[in-house]
Amino acid sequence: MGIYAITGASSGIGAKTKELLIQQGHKVINIDLKDGDICVNLASQEGRQSAVDQLHTMCPDGLDGMICNAGVSGACGNLGLIISLNYFGTVAVANGVYDLLKKKHGSCVVTVSNTISQGAGRKDIVDLLNNIGDEKRVLSLISSMDSTNLSVGNSLYVSTKYALARWVRRVSATWAANGVRINAVAPGNVHTAMTATMSTTAKMALNALPIPTKYGQECLMAPEEIAEVMVFLASDSEIGRAHV
């Protein structure tokens, strides 16, 4: 069967995705801050490079799939972490294993967002992430922002996720030309540790939106619902290319 790597597979959607892939007989490599097969800090350049290097050592014949799922919410209280992990960590790992995916004509799946509201992000941050890609410059720009202001954190979260969706679209044609599919998944609000940090106001707004799921009247989806989509997109069953 196949060999898949997942960032952030120690809990939440990543853990359910790992579980489902293992049930299907695949080998799964969990990359996480702790309790992973590869334990690194993907918010740091050193951690990202270490993860990529270890994957190249462990999978010399290639990867069937890379699922970039690790991320933090806007309520984490660390603005630099939001930028470095959500955007730069994801892009660096995906680019770092691109050659491994080419060897098997594999697939890359990127978790784009749990919560994106039109207009909630900062276009200047999105443009800097996509068009400049200078992590130090972005971190310097946000260093004077108020990390205790939840709206600031949420705005940066949305910005990183918009930038990821845009990045996926930009690279999709080149990757597809080399036999590698790349897709993005926007899960929405899911029962995870991330959504457990939602403010009372956010929870009230969520309760006012009767979004149907296969579980009926639940306001939040179960992680396994998203895991099924992730596994489908990472598998050979997915014949389309470059979807968000």
What are these regions (language model features)?
Residues 10, 14-19:
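N-terminal Rossmann NAD(P)H-binding glycine-rich loop of SDR-like oxidoreductase domains
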Residues 33-47:
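Rossmann-fold cofactor-recognition segment
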Residues 43-60:
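Conserved Rossmann-fold cofactor-binding substructure of NAD(P)-dependent oxidoreductases
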Residues 67, 110-112, 182-185, 195:
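Hydrophobic structural elements of the Rossmann-like NAD(P)H-binding subdomain
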Residues 72-76, 106-177, 189-192:
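Catalytic loop of short-chain dehydrogenase/reductase
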Residues 92, 165, 184, 205-241:
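C-terminal helical subdomain
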Residues 186-197, 201:
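Short, flexible catalytic-loop segment of classical short-chain dehydrogenase/reductase
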